Amino acid sequence: MKKILVVEDEESLRLFYEEELKAEGYDILTARNGREAIRQLETGKPDLIILDIVMPVMDGMETLGRIVGQERKIPVILNTSYSGYRQDFMSWAADAYVTKSHDLTELKRKIRELLEKGKGQ
């Protein structure tokens, strides 16, 4: 079973993503901010990371930089309400960029695509 780390500070969205992705057959880890996400990487390696950008403690861009420096083989999907970050240089380090929606069709498609692609191979 593929393991996905969902990094999202809004509890209702984090629980929604967890429920929806578990129904798709994924094992889900969650983190409320970048610092928790980095801790999760130290204890268990997910197959993919879904990363919010605007979060307290450690934002998504700083978290992305640390992930890229430590675990480049793990694909990262930036998932945000703010489309302006798409042009941010640091966002180019992510494998995909998906605008948040309660319709997870696009997010699920990107997850399947990246997991099937087998990053780093």
Annotate each language-model stretch with its function.
Residues 52:
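Active-site residues of response regulator receiver
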Residues 33-36, 59-62:
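Acidic catalytic/metal-coordinating carboxylates
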Residues 55:
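Receiver (REC) domain active-site loop signature in two-component systems and cognate sites
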Residues 62, 83-109:
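Alpha4 helix (beta4-alpha4-beta5 surface) of REC/receiver domains from two-component response regulators
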Residues 18, 102-115, 119:
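C-terminal output helix
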Residues 77-79:
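Hydrophobic/aromatic residues positioned on beta-strands within the core alpha/beta folds
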Residues 8:
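Conserved acidic carboxylate
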Residues 11-29:
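Two-component/phosphorelay signaling modules centered on CheY-like receiver
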